[in-house]
Each structure stands twice: as structure tokens, then as C-alpha cells.
Amino acid sequence: MAEAENNLQILLYSDDREVRQQVINSVGIKPAADLPKITWDETATATITRDKVHNNRYDLLILDGEATKISGISVAKTLHEEENDLPPILVLTARQQDEWLVGWAGAKSVERPLTPLKLQEAVAAALR
């Protein structure tokens, strides 16, 4: 139990279960040798994501910028308006042109295609 308490807490938002599974499988339980293990928390709606961020402590948020109803970019912007103390945020994007919008929302972008190496490096950099 004590080991789980020392794990990094990552919230992953996507309305697409396959995207969530791809991210978790790509990053794994440890994104880099010098970082602790990860405990993943998954959400499929923006409302639940906002509630969880409001009521829990996370080390990193990963949001799907291509979520259909409410994009991860919109969720990131809303969280920055509502919360005082946020962890780093990564937004998964489909287009390089979205990078400026992700920055405006207070996050960093990870452009598709999502490869394991790209995701591991982005997660490790955000957590350091």
C-alpha cells in the first residue's frame, strides 16, 4: 500500500477507449528509469475530468485534443480558469497547427501519431 502512495498520479481524459488504452500501453507503468511508477486514472467526459481534478491531486493531466464533445484543449483552458494549482498538462493533438492553441490553453502538445517513444519522452519531461 505504501508503494502505491508514492506512485505518480496521472489523469487521462479521452472519450475514446482505444486512445486511452494506447496511451497507457505506450507509456506503461514507468515512463523513465529515474521516475516512480504511475497510477492511471481514466475519464471519458469533460465533466468527470473537471470534478476529479477539483477533488484529487494529480502529478500530470493528459487530455485528448480530439475528444468529440469537448476537446482536451477546451478542458485545459477551463481548468486553468477554475483551478489555482494545476499539474502540468499534455494535450494530444492531430495537427501541428494546434500547438499555439494548446499553448494558449496553458498546456503542451503531443502531436499524433502517438508512438510509445514520443509519449514516454513527453510524459517523463512533464513529470521532471
What are these model-predicted stretches?
Residues 57-59, 83-88:
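His-Asp phosphorelay/catalytic-motif detector in bacterial-type signaling
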Residues 7-28, 61:
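Conserved acidic segment of CheY-like receiver
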Residues 15, 92-96, 104-124:
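Output/docking surface of receiver
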Residues 64, 88-93:
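Short beta-strand elements of ligand-binding domains
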Residues 31-40:
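A generic structural motif
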Residues 59-80:
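Conserved phosphotransfer microenvironments
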Residues 42-60:
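Acidic, metal-coordinating helix/loop segments flanking the phosphotransfer/catalytic sites
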